[in-house]
Amino acid sequence: MAVLRSLLPQLGLFLCLALCFSPALSASYNDPCTVFDTISTTNLRVNITAEGSGENITYTVWVHVNSSVSVVILKAVNQDNKPVGTWVGATQECNDSSVLYRVTPSDNSDFQATWIVPNSEDITKVNLHVLMAIGNGTAAVTSVNLGEPQTSTPLRPTPEISETNQTTTMTTDKTPAMTTAKTPAMTTAKTTAKTTAKTTVKTTAMTTAKTTAKSLAVNALGSPLAGALHILLVFLISKLLF
């Protein structure tokens, strides 16, 4: 009995400490990153953009949220289910290598998170898991494979139009227009030029011939010397005949 009486103060102190630390132990066990009553798989609107070069690439992850979303949980893993990269500005790190961001409720806004990945990492083999807590122990989750082309995760720039396509377009568009525009104009111009030239030459030739003949007749009849020679010629012929 004496031994039990000596141990009572120590047992009381132990029970007191256990009661004090039990809330903390319970909180650490009930990780807010993993405890949800209902988790539904859905297609969330997720956009990812990349920038920077060198040893690290900085990715910006955009998640569309609404007023019912209070928490966004992000996790990036490779094919071996190992975490990839570092998340910047997370509110809390979870036990399963995911990170938790608390979101201020707002209507139709975009949540933004920064993700830094080593340049040596093959990003095409990474899966990005996005989970949104929407209250009452309910969450919506989606997974994005960064190696698959998706409209919601534009990691690669849009390919430019090839030179072959541009050449084909120019040939198709310009050739008919040029042919249609030039052919009637050239035909009309040539026909008009030929007709005008022929008419001008013919008119000029006829006018010149008539003018020359008329001028010769006038000159022959109107000149005094020509009249005198004509009279002399008539006189000589009459003398020879008679």
Swiss-Prot record:
Instruction: Mark the residues modified by lipid (GPI-anchor amidated serine).
Output: 223
Q: How is it modified after translation?
A: N-glycosylated. GPI-anchored.
Cite a GO CC annotation: external side of plasma membrane
Alphabetical keyword list: Cell membrane, Differentiation, Glycoprotein, GPI-anchor, Lipoprotein, Membrane, Signal
**Acyltransferase keyword on record:** no
GO process terms (BP): cell differentiation; negative regulation of cell-matrix adhesion; positive regulation of cell migration; wound healing, spreading of epidermal cells
Q: In which tissues is it expressed?
A: Present at high level in the dermal sheath cells near the bulge area of the hair follicle and in the differentiated sebocytes of the normal adult skin (at protein level).
Which residues are tagged as glycosylated in the record? 47, 56, 66
Q: Residues of the signal sequence?
A: 1-26
The membrane topology noted for this protein in its Swiss-Prot or TrEMBL record is: Lipid-anchor; GPI-anchor
State the source organism's domain of life. Eukaryota
Relate the induction remark in this record: Following tissue damages of the skin.
Which purpose does this protein serve, as stated in its record? Modulates leading keratinocyte migration and cellular adhesion to matrix proteins during a wound-healing response and promotes wound repair. May play a role during trichilemmal differentiation of the hair follicle.
Name assigned to this protein: Placenta-expressed transcript 1 protein
The organism encoding this protein is Mesocricetus auratus
Q: What is the lineage of its organism?
A: Eukaryota, Metazoa, Chordata, Craniata, Vertebrata
